[in-house]
């Protein structure tokens, strides 16, 4: 085998290997899920409305079957949601996204919060939502 054919064969083999790799190159998107986590100063939260935006969102599901989630897509990269149930610190929503590498582009905001007796909180101080893999 000539040297040029051998080099061509090696380059072809490496290219095929890279194309079949589980580690995509930096320019390719990888669909998956991100987690929306709630930070709350109270132990008796029962409902909230929130907004997530920044990058495309395909859908959302509650992380726990005891939580009820309703969503409305504002546009391709903004979703408004309402969640009811015994809300506590930690994961509350799973976001289905076309590119998990874009996690840093998402922002999430608590719009309203109510206690378990359906009374709106007078202040949202201490509440936060974060989006992370």
Predicted regions mapped to residue ranges:
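Sec-dependent bacterial lipoprotein signal peptides
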Residues: 1-21
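Acidic, low-complexity intrinsically disordered segments
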Residues: 20-133
């Amino acid at each position: 085998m000539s040297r040029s054919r051998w080099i061509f064969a090696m380059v072809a083999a490496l290219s095929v290997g890279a194309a079949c790799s589980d580690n995509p190159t930096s320019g390719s998107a990888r669909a998956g899920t991100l987690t929306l986590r709630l930070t709350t100063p109270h132990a008796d939260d029962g409902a909230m409305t929130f907004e997530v935006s920044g990058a495309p969102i395909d859908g959302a599901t509650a992380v726990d079957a005891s939580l009820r989630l309703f969503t409305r897509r504002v546009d391709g990269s903004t979703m408004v949601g309402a969640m009811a149930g015994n809300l506590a610190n930690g994961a509350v929503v799973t976001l289905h996204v076309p590119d998990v590498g874009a996690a840093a582009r998402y922002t999430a905001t608590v719009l309203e919060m109510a206690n378990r007796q359906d009374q709106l909180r007078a202040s949202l101080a201490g509440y936060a939502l974060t989006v992370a893999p």
